[in-house]
Amino acid sequence: MVWWDDPDDAFCEDPFDPEGDYGALQVGKQPMNRYVICYDIVDDKRRLKVAKCLDSYGSRVQFSVFEVLVSKPLMTRMVRELGALINAKTDRISIYPQCATCDARRTDLGATVEKPVHEPWIIV
């Protein structure tokens, strides 16, 4: 079992959070956490597919770096989709959780990109 699938794993634990909610944003009933995802994909076609997949979950902040704001179930789905797109022998995707405390202390220099904020969808 991996960390994003473990039901007993606290989601984005932050030991400095006195409230104990670990700084997760709440959208509806789902806690949302931010991740920085970077990749090194050898093949151009696979790289484009990975970029399109990540673009559907978040915002590109560099050529091979995305920020996503997702719930735990969406994180699981995204990781499975990405895993199916890459060649594990030659490609690499790194996913870095970013707690709310760390995100609040973030510094951007130069041209910046808006932090992704996903509003809940209401389908009628």
UniProtKB/Swiss-Prot annotation:
Binding site for Mg(2+): 40
Superkingdom field: Bacteria
Key words, A-Z: Antiviral defense, Endonuclease, Hydrolase, Magnesium, Metal-binding, Nuclease
Pfam name, any one: CRISPR_Cas2
Keyword Metal-binding attached: yes
CDD domains from the UniProt entry: Cas2_I_II_III
Transmembrane segments: none
InterPro entries: CRISPR_associated_Cas2, Virulence_VapD/CRISPR_Cas2
Biological role: CRISPR (clustered regularly interspaced short palindromic repeat), is an adaptive immune system that provides protection against mobile genetic elements (viruses, transposable elements and conjugative plasmids). CRISPR clusters contain sequences complementary to antecedent mobile elements and target invading nucleic acids. CRISPR clusters are transcribed and processed into CRISPR RNA (crRNA). Functions as a ssRNA-specific endoribonuclease. Involved in the integration of spacer DNA into the CRISPR cassette.
UniProt record similarity statement: Belongs to the CRISPR-associated endoribonuclease Cas2 protein family.
Official protein name in the record: CRISPR-associated endoribonuclease Cas2 4
Organism field: Rhodospirillum rubrum (strain ATCC 11170 / ATH 1.1.1 / DSM 467 / LMG 4362 / NCIMB 8255 / S1)
